[in-house]
């Protein structure tokens, strides 16, 4: 397989790297680009890794993941969503992106179709191209109010569709599917004999008070055709650990384990034991963190909407603010370049999340209130 030209540089990393170089050169830059939680990894995770290393748990482990962690994940989702998974239906991976990539690599064949609902996480098209370069990608855009056009999705999916790739809670838009939308996506997939749903739910815990995340795990009729991917980067700030997982039927999990065996061998053994500690402790940091995010998001929303160029809606989850820039008369890359050059604020162009969204940009508000106020002060001067 040649390295396909369809693999593109992620614009959030591009702008973040540019900002890092400018900071090294002594320039005062405020980066609201990368989605990284501004909290510390729980001490019990670090202690669990250290303990595992002292006990000699530093060697090869099962390519599917250590049994204790797989069993704990299965029990956790069963308790939350009322589903019925076992450890044999769980696959541990070095991050959510690899978890998705493993599934795509094991499912896709040349000329298969994948339908992506946009705005989408920026790595999806490249992940698909790497897994199977001859895949036909179809994009179904959300409506302007971020609701799903069920009729358009139904029209896009056919018997050639191998996967419908979805992300709710959504990065970059901070929106979530309704119960009806989740059920409708399942019904559409089940109309066709070989169509899977790959659901990225890594922001499932970062939901604001009064809002409800509807997981595909709750839809029991889709279980055999569902790949649910998740991880610990957002819920436990473990971005640098690279640790994620997927839930799928046993047959597919076995294929993914074989794929991992012949590529990565296994996900880091001591890190898996650190993650195991997550399921032995209460997740009592989540509620106050979400309250803090909502407070910061409300501040940012109220302030940035005073600017004539920017109009956004208050998100329901996560730490991204999705803002319309049509009033500026410019496209997303141009606006992001000018924000950086003129006032030293870094954002991510909307076009990287789907072609329809070139009149949007994304800000990450996973920074302190002081940093956000500094950013707003600068953005107020931007013209």
Each model region followed by its residue ranges:
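Generic structural signal for well-ordered alpha-helical scaffold segments
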Residues: 20, 74, 78, 104-105
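Conserved N-terminal alpha-helix of the aminotransferase class I/II PLP-enzyme fold
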Residues: 60-93
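A short, well-ordered alpha-helical element
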Residues: 11-19
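A glycine-/small-polar-enriched, mobile loop at the entrance of the PLP active site in fold-type I
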Residues: 31-38, 51-70
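PLP-dependent class I/II
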Residues: 2, 6-10, 22-30, 36-52, ...
């Amino acid at each position: 397989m040649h390295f396909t030209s369809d693999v593109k540089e992620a614009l959030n990393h591009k702008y973040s790297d540019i900002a890092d170089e400018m900071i090294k050169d002594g320039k005062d830059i405020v980066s609201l680009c990368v989605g990284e939680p501004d909290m510390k990894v729980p001490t019990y995770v670090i202690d669990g890794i250290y303990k595992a290393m002292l006990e000699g748990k530093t060697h090869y482990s099962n390519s599917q993941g250590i049994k204790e962690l797989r069993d704990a994940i299965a029990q956790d989702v069963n308790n939350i969503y009322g589903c019925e998974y076992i450890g044999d239906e769980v696959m541990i991976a070095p991050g959510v992106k690899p978890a998705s990539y493993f599934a795509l690599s094991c499912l896709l064949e040349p000329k298969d179709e994948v339908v992506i609902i946009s705005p989408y996480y920026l790595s999806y098209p490249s992940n698909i191209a790497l897994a199977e370069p001859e895949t036909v990608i179809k994009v179904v855009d959300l409506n302007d109010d971020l609701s799903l056009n069920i009729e358009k999705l139904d029209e896009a999916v056919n018997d050639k569709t191998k996967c419908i790739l979805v992300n709710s809670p959504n990065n970059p838009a901070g929106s979530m599917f309704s119960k009806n939308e989740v059920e409708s996506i399942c019904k559409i997939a089940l109309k066709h004999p070989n169509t899977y749903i790959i659901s990225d739910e890594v922001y499932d815990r970062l939901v604001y008070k009064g809002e409800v995340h509807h997981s595909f795990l709750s839809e029991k009729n889709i279980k055999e055709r569902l790949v649910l991917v998740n991880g610990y980067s957002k819920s436990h700030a473990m971005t640098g650990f690279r640790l994620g997982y997927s839930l799928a039927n046993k047959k597919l999990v076995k294929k993914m384990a074989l794929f991992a065996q012949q590529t990565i061998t296994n996900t880091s053994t001591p890190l898996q034991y650190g993650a195991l500690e997550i399921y032995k402790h209460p997740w009592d940091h989540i509620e106050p963190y979400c309250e803090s995010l909502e407070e910061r998001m409300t501040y940012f929303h109220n302030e940035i909407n005073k600017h004539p160029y920017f109009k956004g809606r208050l998100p329901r989850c996560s730490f991204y603010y999705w803002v319309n820039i049509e009033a500026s008369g410019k496209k997303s890359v141009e606006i992001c370049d000018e924000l950086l050059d003129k006032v030293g604020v870094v954002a991510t162009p909307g076009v990287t999340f789907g072609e329809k969204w070139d009149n949007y940009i994304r800000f990450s508000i996973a920074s302190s209130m002081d940093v956000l106020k500094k950013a707003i002060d600068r953005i107020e001067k931007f013209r």
